[in-house]
UniProtKB/Swiss-Prot annotation:
Gene from which this protein is expressed: mtgA
GO molecular function annotations of the record: pentosyltransferase activity; peptidoglycan glycosyltransferase activity
Location relative to the cell: Cell inner membrane
Transmembrane segments: 25-45
Protein name: Biosynthetic peptidoglycan transglycosylase
Main location per the UniProt record: membrane
Keyword Cell wall biogenesis/degradation in record: yes
PANTHER family given in the database record: BIOSYNTHETIC PEPTIDOGLYCAN TRANSGLYCOSYLASE, MONOFUNCTIONAL BIOSYNTHETIC PEPTIDOGLYCAN TRANSGLYCOSYLASE
Record field: catalytic activity: [GlcNAc-(1->4)-Mur2Ac(oyl-L-Ala-gamma-D-Glu-L-Lys-D-Ala-D-Ala)](n)-di-trans,octa-cis-undecaprenyl diphosphate + beta-D-GlcNAc-(1->4)-Mur2Ac(oyl-L-Ala-gamma-D-Glu-L-Lys-D-Ala-D-Ala)-di-trans,octa-cis-undecaprenyl diphosphate = [GlcNAc-(1->4)-Mur2Ac(oyl-L-Ala-gamma-D-Glu-L-Lys-D-Ala-D-Ala)](n+1)-di-trans,octa-cis-undecaprenyl diphosphate + di-trans,octa-cis-undecaprenyl diphosphate + H(+)
InterPro entries recorded: Glyco_trans_51 (IPR001264), Lysozyme-like_dom_sf (IPR023346), PBP_transglycosylase (IPR036950), Pep_trsgly (IPR011812)
Keyword Repeat: no
Length: 244
């Protein structure tokens, strides 16, 4: 007489489906956490050590070398104390007047930019703070997508959480673009005025702050009436600008 063979319990179809869905989701979540950890590790490292390059600098150098293989960037890091206080005030007055008050996002500026974009029926003004601009420069491309904006938001939160306002401003002034192949305020001061960043006058600082939105364009159009008028407005706002 044959013994009856034990039967395996049938795996239910819903359980198979849930397992099939759960594994890719866990893999995706793990990949996302690793990706964000890469940003976080860099930011924590920069609390004590200064970045020597940025994603934007690398992109610009790649483009420049397509035309000239021997092209190089002009860039020299200088510490916070070696940067003119006039320049710090000018940049805050021009780019982020509430820099010391917000936590990375200036909602009043965002609202103003949104209304301006609706009025002009195009995406022009962005209302980005210094922290948001730093996030883009350090890690991201210049594309305007929802995915890039979400990464920018997360990186901005990390910058504000792990770096002081003083450190954020110091890195920002040292890595943003100021002209064609010109990065950082020391290279900019020497390129435009033949002096160090520490020696910039209020008028020179205001002019440099005025070209930040489109530095390559203004590099060859330094006396445009619109630009000079903007620099005068920034100059008038220097006394009210608060720096860390």
């Amino acid at each position: 007489m044959k013994l009856a063979q034990a039967r395996r319990p049938a795996t239910s179809k819903p359980r198979l489906i849930s397992t099939w869905l759960l594994r890719p989701l866990l893999l995706l979540l793990t990949a996302a956490l690793l990706y964000q950890s890469w940003f976080l590790l860099h930011i924590v490292y920069w609390r004590s050590y200064s970045p020597t390059t940025s994603a934007f600098m690398q992109d610009r150098l790649k483009i420049m070398r397509q035309q000239n293989p021997a092209a190089s960037l002009q860039h020299q890091w200088v510490d916070y104390e070696q940067i003119s206080s006039h320049l710090k005030r000018a940049v805050i007055a021009a780019e982020d007047a509430r820099f010391l008050q917000h936590q990375g996002f200036d909602y009043k500026a965002i609202e103003t930019a949104w209304k301006k974009n609706l009025k002009q029926r195009k995406w022009a003004a962005g209302g980005s703070t210094i922290s948001q601009q730093l996030a883009k420069n350090l890690f991201l491309s210049t594309e305007k997508t929802v995915w890039r904006k979400s990464r920018e938001t997360l990186i901005t939160l990390m910058l504000e959480e792990f770096l002081t306002k003083r450190r954020i401003l110091e890195i920002y002034l040292n890595i943003i673009e100021w002209g064609d192949g010109i990065f950082g305020i020391e290279a900019a001061a020497r390129h435009y005025f033949g002096i160090s960043a520490a020696s910039l006058t209020p008028a020179q600082a205001a002019w440099l702050a005025s070209i930040i939105p489109n530095p390559r364009f203004y590099d060859t159009r330094r006396t445009l009436p619109k630009l000079l008028n903007k620099s005068r407005i920034i100059l008038s706002r220097l006394p009210a600008a608060k720096i860390p």
